[in-house]
Amino acid sequence: MKKNKMNQKGFTLIELLAVIVILAILMTLAVTSMQRYINNAKKDTYITTAQQFLDSVRLGVTNGDYETPDIGSCTVVAIKNIEKTTGTKQSPYGKPYNDAKSYVVVYNKAQAAQETSLEYYMSMDDSLDNWFVLTKESGLKRSIVFSRDSTTAGNITEVSATGATLTLDSSGGTATTCTVSSFEG
């Protein structure tokens, strides 16, 4: 008696399912990695844009377009004023900047009347709630940019006129503050 043996060619259902599961896991990892890469690229662009705004204000102070602050005071330049010279109107996230919370601060930390020692600070916020609080120029980096899905609470001081007091740096126990002597908004 002859036994009919099936000619086994191809894959079993279990083997096919295993391959599909492995491919799904690999795709999930790839998509997650790509999203993180895109988000980091947007944050880097956010910081680069902030640096361009700072450079524009630094040039404006040098050229006399913006007022050099007196000792211990600061000049605040709103982003909407800087946008005119840089051409940047939207954040990397595709939304306009919040005018009241996006500005450059020029602080004169000089000790004597005959010297000028300027420090530059920046605060940015867009209408999608991607932001960073008032930060010294040297501290601008990707890790300070937060987004709307962040659990970190943002406390950006709104500036709209002269006379406001800004806290520039509170690290080290003592706070550095300045009074806004000029507002370019």
Language model feature labels by segment:
Residues 162-185:
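Short, low-complexity, Pro/Ser/Thr/Gly-rich segments in the mature regions of secreted, periplasmic
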Residues 1-6:
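N-terminal secretory signal peptides that target proteins for export/translocation
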Residues 39-67:
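Membrane-proximal N-terminal amphipathic helix
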Residues 65-156, 184-185:
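Extracellular/periplasmic head regions of type IV pilus-like filament subunits
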Residues 21, 27, 46-47, 53, ...:
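Conserved short hydrophobic patches within well-ordered secondary structure
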Residues 7-35:
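N-terminal single-pass transmembrane signal-anchor helix
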